[in-house]
Amino acid sequence: MRSPSAAWLLGGVLLLAASGSCNRTVPGNKSKGRSLIGNVDNSPVVAGRGVTVKPGFSVDEFSTSVLTGKLTTVFLPVVYTIVFVVGLPSNGMALWVFLFRTKKKHPAVIYMANLALADLLSVTWFPLKIAYHIHGNNWIYGESLCKVLIGFFYGNMYCSILFMTCLSVQRYWVIVNPMVHPKKQANIAIGVSLGIWLLILLLTIPLYVVKQTSYIRALNITTCHDVLPEEVLVGDMFNYFLSLAIGVFLFPAFLTASAYVLMIRTLQSSAMDESSGKKRRRAIKLIVTVLAMYLICFTPSNLLLVVHYFLIKTRGQSHVYALYIVALCLSTLNSCIDPFVYYFISQDFRDHAKNALLCRSVRTVKRMQVSLSSKKFSGKSSSYSSSSTSVKGSY
């Protein structure tokens, strides 16, 4: 269990770094907000007749360095581009395999199909996010699209957490109760999946209610979600994200870790022969890998999110936002890792994915299977006839 421990250690290191950074001050800056807090800019602006001046916000030096630095204008778009290029085709193919190539809709298949759909819906909007960061964190697509982007972004993260939790609990349930009827399990999985989508839809409503765009007059840019008024950050957003972190991350993470630990104990305590032992060791390695990926992708971002808003609420300043957006960006790598997890978990998915990459139709695959089975049968029958002939000759 070294990998999960490493995940928690990584979260602890980020937390210590964040705590240390919040004590630094910027010389000559007396602004209260040290994170991306927007204060209403009431400075006089000289404008010609007929020229409309947009109401804007002012930000401090730290926020300015984040909005104009290489971290947000180079690093973030590079990572998001990689996730988009890898995640779009891989999740699209995964969803196609689950929906149209997999005949037996087991609960695991249902959860993985929903997970692929959540990743696909999120990755589809990445070009807008990439363009936003490349153009100096300047959002030109309007308030409505900004809300949709943010809603899908956070919705995908918590959808992934919940569906991966369902997968872990379902896999443990199958090991403990192997005699439960698959059809009954599939119906339960469909109901749970619909419930998760409805829950995420309700949980993301506040993101559509709060105004997400802010015009920064000094930089002449319009940010999307990166700069919000201080009263919104301290009040609404603090309570909202704290509830999400506890209810939709911490509790599911505890369930996921518990299910996988119990699964490993059950597999280790079961008596098996040598061939089954190899499969058991492979299953345990896969379980540890999936659990480590889960914790590494989602723990730092959710931990730093709570720390960021807590520091704003208690101290009125925070330098954690830069670390948080990096952790949040790296958590999106989960969207392009998930299809490879499907590949190693499911033998059916491996076969269908290989056939899809080789452009084989379902009919062609069936013909190949019939041909191989007939060859095996003919080989067995020929060996039987030859052995019977030799027996006759001996008499």
From Swiss-Prot:
Extent of the signal sequence:
1-25
State where the protein is found.
Answer: Cell membrane
After translation, how is this protein modified? A proteolytic cleavage generates a new N-terminus that functions as a tethered ligand. Activating serine proteases include trypsin, mast cell tryptase, coagulation factors VII and Xa, myeloblastin/PRTN3 and membrane-type serine protease 1/ST14. Proposed subsequent cleavage by serine proteases is leading to receptor deactivation and include neutrophil elastase and cathepsin G. At least in part, implicated proteases are also shown to activate the receptor; the glycosylation status of the receptor is thought to contribute to the difference.
Q: Please list the GO terms describing molecular function.
A: G protein-coupled receptor activity; G-protein alpha-subunit binding; G-protein beta-subunit binding; thrombin-activated receptor activity
State the UniProt keywords alphabetically. Answer: Cell membrane, Disulfide bond, G-protein coupled receptor, Glycoprotein, Immunity, Inflammatory response, Innate immunity, Lipoprotein, Membrane, Palmitate, Phosphoprotein, Receptor, Signal, Transducer, Transmembrane, Transmembrane helix, Ubl conjugation
Answer whether the UniProt record assigns the keyword Metal-binding to this protein: no
Q: A GO biological process this protein is involved in?
A: leukocyte migration
* Extracellular-facing ranges: 35-69, 136-147, 210-233, 316-321
Disulfide partners: C146-C224
Taxonomically, the superkingdom here is Eukaryota
Q: Which residues are glycosylated?
A: N23, N29, N220
The record gives the membrane topology as:
Multi-pass membrane protein
Q: Which residues cross the membrane?
A: 70-99, 107-135, 148-175, 182-209, 234-267, 276-315, 322-345
Oligomeric state and partners? Interacts with TLR4, COPS5 and TMED2. Interacts with GNAQ, GNA11, GNA12, GNA13 and GNA14.
Function comment: Receptor for trypsin and trypsin-like enzymes coupled to G proteins. Its function is mediated through the activation of several signaling pathways including phospholipase C (PLC), intracellular calcium, mitogen-activated protein kinase (MAPK), I-kappaB kinase/NF-kappaB and Rho. Can also be transactivated by cleaved F2R/PAR1. Involved in modulation of inflammatory responses and regulation of innate and adaptive immunity, and acts as a sensor for proteolytic enzymes generated during infection. Generally is promoting inflammation.
Protein name as annotated: Proteinase-activated receptor 2
Gene (UniProt): F2RL1
